[in-house]
Each structure stands twice: as C-alpha cells, then as structure tokens.
Amino acid sequence: MDIKSNSFFYIFISVVLLLIAILQYDLWFSNTGFIKYQALKKSVISQQKEVKHKSQTNVQLYSEVVSLRQNSEVLESLARENMGLIKQGEVFYSVK
C-alpha cells in the first residue's frame, strides 16, 4: 500500500505542476497575457502622444482660421506672401 500511495502522490504532484505550467503559459504568452498587455500599453501611450500633438496642431490651426475670419489685413498679408497677390495699380518687385 505504501507504493500505491507513493505513486498517487507523484501523480498528484505531476498534475499540479502541469496545471501550474499551463496557467503560467497563459499568464505570459496568451492574447490576454502579460507580454501582450505590455505591447498594448506601449501602443496606447504612443497613440496618446500622437493625439496630444494633433490636438495642439488643431488649436493652432483654429486660431489661425479665427484670425483670418476676423481680420482682413491678416488674410491680405497671407495672400500676398503665399499667392503673390497685388492690388490694382501696384507694381511687384522681386529682389533676389
């Protein structure tokens, strides 16, 4: 009976170790595991930085749009610089 209980003990320990190994594999390497979690966490941080940068750009562009709508001098200045706009009767000189 000693051999029988001894073999039962070894089988029990083997099953417990196998279950622990399966759970550890699931913890580290599955789709919901720690390694996947770390990769997703890095991705979220990167995307949050990108969103913050784009929000700042949007604020700058919005302020530019507001200034263009409210001040015709700003609009005229921008048209002169970027599109070469000149008024009737003006002469444009390009100095290089």
UniProtKB/Swiss-Prot annotation:
Q: Which residues lie on this side of the membrane: Periplasmic?
A: 30-96
- GO cellular component, as recorded: cell division site; cell septum; plasma membrane
What ranges does the Cytoplasmic topological domain annotation cover? 1-11
Q: Where in the cell is it found?
A: Cell inner membrane
**One Pfam family, short name please?**
DivIC
Q: What is the lineage of its organism?
A: Bacteria, Pseudomonadati, Pseudomonadota, Gammaproteobacteria, Thiotrichales
Its placement in the membrane is given as:
Single-pass type II membrane protein
Keywords from the named record: Cell cycle, Cell division, Cell inner membrane, Cell membrane, Membrane, Transmembrane, Transmembrane helix
- UniProt-listed InterPro entries: Cell_div_FtsB, FtsL/DivIC
Function, as annotated, reads: Essential cell division protein. May link together the upstream cell division proteins, which are predominantly cytoplasmic, with the downstream cell division proteins, which are predominantly periplasmic.
What name has this protein been given in UniProt?
Answer: Cell division protein FtsB
Q: What species was this sequence derived from?
A: Francisella tularensis subsp. tularensis (strain SCHU S4 / Schu 4)
* Family from the record: Belongs to the FtsB family.
GO terms in the biological process aspect are: FtsZ-dependent cytokinesis
What broad class describes the main subcellular location of this protein? membrane
**Complex formation:** Part of a complex composed of FtsB, FtsL and FtsQ.
Transmembrane segments annotated in the record for this chain: 12-29
